[in-house]
A protein has these predicted regions:
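Bacterial N-terminal signal peptides that target proteins for export
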Residues: 2-11
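Acidic, metal/ion-coordinating pockets
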Residues: 22-159
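Bacterial N-terminal signal peptides
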Residues: 10-19
Length: 159
């Protein structure tokens, strides 16, 4: 029984020394992730009278503050950012496309690392999205479930 306790203590000491030495060998890195989503084309802060939140200018300022403080945030949008409505028609398509271009221009200036394609982004069709990706090559449009029907290849980067 006594030798069994010694054996357990030896295993515990080996376990602690291995994991302690491994933790010292790697430097920990701070990762900052800024995630937005379901923006629905809203450029300005929300309408609350007390402490209004959101808005592209505020987002731009906060993300730049992080960068100026030596942080390198990964900035992503989860999708549904382009349009203020899911009912695109001949009466509003011009204004909604203008809103979309304004959003993408702002996201480009903010320095977004990736934009997931949500259902709102699909309202004006794949060809329009491909055209937008070409106009804003520094923005990565992401989707792991939109494929070319003929080739089965991803239309946008899956990651």
């Amino acid at each position: 029984m006594k030798s069994n306790n010694i054996f357990k203590k030896e295993i515990l000491l080996i376990f602690i020394s291995v994991f302690y030495s491994c933790s010292e060998a790697f430097e920990q890195e701070d990762i900052r992730l800024v995630l937005t989503g379901s923006v629905h084309g809203q450029l300005d802060p929300c309408g609350w009278k007390k402490n209004p939140l959101g808005g592209l200018p505020r987002r731009y300022t906060k993300i730049n503050e992080m960068r100026e403080n030596g942080q390198s945030p990964i900035v992503l949008d989860a999708g549904d950012m382009f349009y203020s409505t899911n009912k695109i028609n001949t009466n509003n398509i011009k204004s909604e496309k203008h809103r979309c271009m304004t959003m993408l221009d702002a996201y480009d200036k903010i320095g977004y690392d990736g934009i997931n394609i949500g259902n709102y982004e699909l309202l004006t069709g794949i060809d329009y999205l491909i055209n937008l990706q070409n106009k804003f090559p520094s923005l990565s449009f992401l989707s792991s479930n939109i494929k070319n029907i003929n080739t089965d290849e991803f239309i946008f980067s899956p990651h």
